[in-house]
């Protein structure tokens, strides 16, 4: 709905479930956007020097583990980045870095300079509730920065290492094990989803909040899929190129 007298974005509302919510600046972009998604847009003041070689090599390693015969593994670095949508060829014959390239493969200092809110905050809370008192709210906070391809492992390890372990002694075994109370695979998938579905137009970090009885993961933005369709198969991708990587 749109009320012309109020102007934009104040006069625009979108239906979310049973209620009408006031549109945000990101909603305005979605209404007027071109064919390009945010992750395919060119980053100002960035070039190939902002690519972290270690991140690119780690991608090759992971891709080889999944499919040793993957065609992109035969490409040189520039052609690989172009195939992934991480760079675009410009009119001068050079290459411009896209947000896919920066967010997935960018150097840590380049990310801090160009997208300072692209980080993960791991927050440990004492108790089961978020406290209004800022002085006593956090038991521990860790902020983690780096390219997405490297940060998933780092964030997952930070949480898993901090979780209490169980105790298991299998029948006919002399060796006890200490399995984590939360499967690594489940946590990893949740962290990956928080990255690929986050809105990079919103200047907020991803927050992993560990309460004494649960873990919550908050990412900037909202679901592009209507709430009434959440139980249906398929998803609407905010960052399709990043999602494909």
Model-identified regions with their sequence ranges:
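N-terminal assembly/transducer modules of large multi-domain enzymes
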Residues: 1-14
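Active-site helix-to-loop segments that bind/position phosphate- or nucleotide-bearing substrates
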Residues: 11-245
């Amino acid at each position: 709905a749109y009320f012309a007298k109020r102007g934009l974005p104040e006069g625009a509302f979108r239906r979310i479930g049973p209620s009408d919510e006031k549109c945000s600046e990101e909603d305005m972009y979605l209404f007027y956007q071109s064919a390009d998604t945010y992750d395919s847009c060119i980053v100002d003041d960035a070039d190939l020097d902002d690519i972290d070689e270690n991140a690119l090599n780690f991608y090759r390693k992971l891709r080889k583990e999944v499919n040793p015969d993957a065609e992109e593994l035969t490409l040189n670095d520039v052609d690989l980045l172009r195939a992934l949508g991480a760079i675009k060829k410009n009119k001068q014959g050079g290459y411009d870095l896209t947000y896919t390239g920066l967010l997935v493969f960018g150097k840590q200092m380049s990310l801090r300079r160009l997208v300072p809110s692209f980080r993960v905050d791991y927050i440990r809370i004492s108790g089961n509730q978020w406290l209004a008192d800022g002085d006593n709210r956090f038991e521990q906070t860790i902020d983690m920065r780096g390219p997405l391809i490297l940060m998933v492992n780092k964030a997952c390890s930070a949480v898993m290492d901090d979780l209490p372990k169980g105790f298991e002694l299998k029948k006919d075994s002399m060796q006890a094990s200490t399995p984590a109370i939360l499967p690594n695979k489940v946590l990893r998938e949740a962290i990956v989803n928080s990255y690929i579905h986050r809105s990079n137009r919103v200047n907020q970090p991803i927050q992993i909040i560990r309460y004494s009885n649960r873990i919550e993961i908050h990412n900037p933005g909202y679901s592009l899929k209507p709430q009434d369709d959440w139980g249906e198969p398929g998803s609407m991708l905010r960052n399709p190129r990043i999602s494909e990587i």
